[in-house]
Amino acid sequence: MKIAVDAMGGDHAPKEIVLGVMKAVAQYKDIEILLFGDETKINEYLTDKTRVKIIHTDEKIESDDEPVRAVKRKKKASMVLAAQAVKDGEADACISAGNTGALMSTGLFVIGRIKGIDRPALAPTLPTVTGKGFVMLDLGANAEAKPEHLLQFGLMGSVYAEKVRKIDRPRVALLNIGTEETKGNDLTKKSFELMKNQDAYEFIGNIEARDLLMDVADVVVTDGFTGNMVLKSIEGTGAAFLSMLKMSLLNGFKNKVAASFLKKDLMELKAKMDYSEYGGACLFGVQAPVVKAHGSSNANGIFTTIRQVREMVEKQVVETIKAEVDKVKVGGTEAND
């Protein structure tokens, strides 16, 4: 199994990318890594070249580059070359911690969309109070969506949850402002109707945002605009809560003593809410596994993303989506590439 990795994408590239790769090849003897980027900089952190190949390029996509323009103009960028390796059959999947929009554009323009899938979807696994986590899509690939798209999102998320997260018959829910079937706008009402009348996956109905982290669903479907706001709200709320908790525990001698006894429990709580432990965000709907690692990923974050991609390839997630897509085909959907 060969995995193409953009060594130059992310806040801590290439150091943390390379260190994560080193950890992965040491752990998994069945993978080979193709590292795309500045060879001199990569070699500074490369401690073992076993099953690691460097493909040198000086070009990279910056975090503030306009995604589509950058992908079209920077043909030799590390991210683009990693995707091209997948397109050419030289790698089975690709990973980048770089510009999210550029990676989505690269996935669509270079690797290509699955026939029968109208829109791709960005899908991370988010934490729950039980530590189990849930897959949520779309979180930003599409600002607007149609009911047919959300129907397909449910299928893609369900396949991933079953194959990679090892959940038998995953519970798929639709994000809405209420649990009743009649609640919501035109998009959610029509999506509910389509999802209710299919048998490709287990649809359990609507879910409210306040219940997302309570482990009531394994897959949650929404449009990209709403999903991205939910993600940022969860991130911001979590960070604010931890900050307030820290200030409270360090305020006064008694609280500091209590904090010393609670340190281990608090660290476990923080780890449980750290969704980087689940890997990166999958770009579903393209012809091969493409995963966006968090931009601030450290070596462990890259390692967990490689582990995630390895599972996707091994369990044939993309192939299963291709085989199952006709089960959620709706008359009048868009033509595909």
Swiss-Prot record:
Record carries keyword Cytoplasm: yes
Entries under Gene3D superfamilies matching the protein: Isopropylmalate Dehydrogenase
UniProt pathway: Lipid metabolism; phospholipid metabolism
A single MF term (Gene Ontology): phosphate:acyl-[acyl carrier protein] acyltransferase activity
Catalytic activity, reaction form: a fatty acyl-[ACP] + phosphate = an acyl phosphate + holo-[ACP]
Primary subcellular site in the record, as a coarse category: cytoplasm
InterPro entries on file: FA_synthesis (IPR003664), Phospholipid_synth_PlsX-like (IPR012281)
Annotated keywords: Cytoplasm, Lipid biosynthesis, Lipid metabolism, Phospholipid biosynthesis, Phospholipid metabolism, Transferase
Protein family membership: Belongs to the PlsX family.
Function: Catalyzes the reversible formation of acyl-phosphate (acyl-PO(4)) from acyl-[acyl-carrier-protein] (acyl-ACP). This enzyme utilizes acyl-ACP as fatty acyl donor, but not acyl-CoA.
Name this polypeptide is given: Phosphate acyltransferase
Organism: Listeria welshimeri serovar 6b (strain ATCC 35897 / DSM 20650 / CCUG 15529 / CIP 8149 / NCTC 11857 / SLCC 5334 / V8)
